[in-house]
Amino acid sequence: MSNAEHSSNFIRNIIIDDLDSKKHDTIITRFPPEPNGYLHIGHAKSIVLNFELGKEFNGRTNLRFDDTNPTKEDTEYVESIKEDVHWLGYNWSELHFASNYFDEMYKRALLLIKKGKAYVCDLTPEEIKEYRGTLTEPGKESPYRNRSIEENLDLFERMRKGEFEDGSKVLRAKIDMSSPNINFRDPIIYRIAHASHHNTGDKWCIYPMYDFAHPLEDAIEGITHSICTLEFADHRPLYDWFVKECEMESVPRQIEFARLNITNTVMSKRKLKQLVDEGIVDGWDDPRMPTVAGLRRRGYTPKSIRNFCKAIGVAKADSTVDSQMLEHFIREDLQETAPRAMAVINPLKLVITNYPEGESEILEIENNPKDESAGKRAVTFSREVYIEREDFMENPPKKYFRLFPGNEVRLKGAYFVKCNEVIKDENGEVTEIHCTYDPETKSGTGFTGRKVKGTIHWVDANNCIPAEFRLYEPLILDDCEENEGKHFLEQINPNSLTICKGFIEPSAKDAKPQDKYQLFRHGYFNVDPNFTSDDNLVFNRIVSLKSSFKLK
């Protein structure tokens, strides 16, 4: 049994029991995002969970936009969410908008009023909060709690017609102001908001609250298993109360699981919006963002995200996942599929003084050292090449096996070269290193005369492509997003992005946005879709080549 299957057993067992007992003939799950922002990796976990359960049990999974708050929602987010779900590899059975149920919700609210289970309240938001009480003190009843059914029906109809100002009245459920569950203390189910809605326009000026709308939406669609995160566990009795008292024909079951927390990662939509609004990142799809759009632009594949979400499974208690686990799955995917190339991101010119001027040759370098069937590619080699600046040191420490005066290394797929001279500018900065090569040491010839301890990569200075390389580190310094109560903006890593100008071998000349490469010794890179143009090739580093992380 896989980790994913084992971890998600408690939800699967519920579904299996329901099917075996004939409680349900089939299952219907749903992914119900609010279209007020871009989806992030936490939403991806919910998408994978719901759609995979639907697939496993031959059921259906709907995509429903929980669009009951007109002031925060936008069609832009609707379209981005649809794109993200498709990109992750899923097709919904039905597409719904909660706003399409507003008429039905209004009828159910009228039913509650007629049953004496709801009333119009004139308390201010501050007074409602004060009257609600605390976890240790019961609430106080609103002075408007015992209005007659007739008066409540009249006031609610006038609320709908737009006769009252925003915030002047609300419709509340009439339950129990002394309940130990604060959610039962006469929760608000409708508020006034004179705002245009992205889907219904100006038809409505009253809008249902989440706790009222969500169970009705599930019941209307015939959802069998309404899977949500743990913060809604205390809301489940209220969820069930609304389904029962609104006399819904279908009775969905709410099941809670732990939300996803990842080290060095902000998961709050409000905080992510703050990062965008304050210009700390360059948008919702910034490659440092944990949004699906950001991960896609960074270079993560749908398969890697799905495998990550399956591997972490579903738990009943909150925990934090190491961000290196997500990196593990993109490495696992790309090491099989990404073409190899050599690139120098911080170039230093190396001149081979005994190589014939004006000449070049074609070398063959393996595409994947672990897969002979991947074949080889042609790379040109000439008198001048670029190497990484960090691959040369004038005064190296012990056990430094790369290039330094008097030392010999192999240029990957080419020859041994020995450093003989260092050229500097007026500031003492190394600008060139002059070497000699040994023609007998060509790779692939079987030369065994002597060995070198270092192999470094390079690109032909006379046949390479200028490129920009964007190197990313975690955006948040602390492992825990809320470490010691510090404001999360204090934990922003000032070095989360480093931009380097370098060169890549000509095999990348036809690279298109979202193409992925393994760059020798550097890691896996993705061609940036936003900044790449015909004359400006930009690579985002997805992950480094190796990690100490071990999948348990």
Swiss-Prot record:
Subcellular location: Cytoplasm
Complex formation: Monomer.
Keywords in alphabetical order: Aminoacyl-tRNA synthetase, ATP-binding, Cytoplasm, Ligase, Nucleotide-binding, Protein biosynthesis
Motif ('KMSKS' region): 266-270
Species name: Clostridium perfringens (strain 13 / Type A)
Binding site for L-glutamine: D66, Y210
PANTHER family according to UniProt: GLUTAMATE--TRNA LIGASE, GLUTAMINE-TRNA LIGASE
Stored InterPro entries: aa-tRNA-synth_I_CS, Gln-tRNA-synth, Gln/Glu-tRNA_Ligase, Gln_tRNA_ligase_bac, Glu/Gln-tRNA-synth, Glu/Gln-tRNA-synth_Ib_cat-dom, Glu/Gln-tRNA-synth_Ib_codon-bd, Glu_tRNA_lig_a-bdl
GO terms for MF: ATP binding; glutamine-tRNA ligase activity
Stated name of the protein: Glutamine--tRNA ligase
